[in-house]
Amino acid sequence: MQADPIVKSVMIVLALASLACWTIIIEKLLRFRMIRRQTHAFETAARNGERLTAEASNLAGRIVAAGYGAWRDQDPSESRMERRERIERAMRLALSYDMRHLQTGLPFLATVGSAAPFIGLLGTVWGIMNSFSAIAASQDTSLSVVAPGIAEALFATAIGLVAAIPAVIAYNKLTTDLGRLQQSFIGGIMMLGDHLARDRNHYLRAEAAE
C-alpha cells in the first residue's frame, strides 16, 4: 500500500492499539474467570461459617488474611458491633487494593474506544486531501487515479472502527463484571465479619488447631 506517511502512521498506531486492546481483553477475561471461582468459594464458606484459608496467592485469601489479622487484634473493651466494623473495614481495604489492580488496562480500553474512530478519521481526511492534491496536479480525474488514494484513506477509518468497537464492548463488559465481583466479595466480607465478631471462640479453637 503506497499510502501517505501520515496515513500509514495512523494505520500503524491504530493496529498496535487494537493488538494491545485484545491482549488486555484476553488477560482480563481469563483473570476474571479465575476470580469468579474464588468469589463463589469465598461466599459459600463465609455463609456457612467455615474457616477460610488465608492464602496470599489469591484475592480471596488476601481478604481473609486481612480479616483474620484484624480479628487477632482484639480489644476487650470494644462491642461486638465495633469489632465487626473494624474487621470488615480491614477486609474492605484489602479488597479495594486488589480492585484497583484489576482495573489496570480498563482506562486504555476506554481511551481507544473513544479516540480510535477520530484518529482513523484524521487519517482519512488527510489521505483524501492528498488525493485531491494529486488529482489537481495530474489533471486526471479518471477512476483509476482517484479510487486508490481515497480507498487507502477510508481504510484508516475502517481500522479505527475495528480497534474501537471491540474496545468499547469489552470495556462495558469488564467494568460490569468487575462491579459484580466486587459486590460478591462485599457480601462475603459482611458474612465473614459477622461470624468473626460473633463467634470468637470458634475461630480461636481453629487457630490453635493449626
Give the predicted meaning of each segment.
Residues 2-47, 55:
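Transmembrane alpha-helix/interfacial motif
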Residues 33-142, 169-210:
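Predominantly long cytosolic amphipathic alpha-helical stalk/bundle segments
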Residues 12-13, 147, 155, 159:
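Alpha-helical transmembrane segments of multi-pass inner-membrane proteins
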Residues 139, 143-153:
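Hydrophobic alpha-helical transmembrane segments and adjacent short intramembrane/lumenal linkers
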Residues 153-167:
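Hydrophobic alpha-helical transmembrane segments of polytopic membrane proteins
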